[in-house]
Amino acid sequence: MPILKPISGHGSTGGIRRYLEKGGRALARDLFNLSYDERDAGALGEDAKEACAWDAEMDATRAAFGTDAPWRGKPARTFKHFVLSPDPGDDIDLATLRELACSWALRHFDDHEIAIVYHDDNARGIPHAHIVVNNANLRTGYRMQTQHPEDLNRDLQDMARERGLSGLSNDRAPESPSKARGRAGAGGPRSRRSVYLGRAEKELSLIHISEPTRPEPI
């Protein structure tokens, strides 16, 4: 199953861009809702993509919307950095990973600026994706909201399986009445979420995302 690791970023996105692109380590980039957008690639051309300073554009967007300001006395979470690591057993190629990463990012963050950078700097040379999502919602002007963060990983698992890749099933087979009674006698049935978390911890894919309870004002 693919592993999704979310990391909260604070401050400028310049630091994360330098980290992701230093030394020519980036295999490829995909950009959305910036001065270059992959969906307009034919009209914009490769030169426009190379010229896109996505970190500076994200910083400017947050400044324009005022989403850099502290929230309830805490430093602003200026961006989210998701590391999407495919299952090594899938032997995924870069093109397949790019399609999966872009589809997942746009499904959940279509109203945000997105930069995806791909690496293969691990022991087995397996490509993986670094997905950087700016905190400002371009449609509402509010900071990023993830009302159901568990859906981020659930959707990734479903999308992987739809593409013939390994993925954790989000469906549980029905239990027999006797098995259900036995589980209840042992402390009650475990929820699908608790089952998933137990397995995910073993796979080092536990998601922990802290979100505000309501949209924050500009």
What are these model-derived regions, one by one?
Residues 1-206, 210:
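N-terminal nicking endonuclease/strand-transfer module with a His-rich metal-binding environment
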Residues 211-214, 218:
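Positively charged, low-complexity/disordered segments
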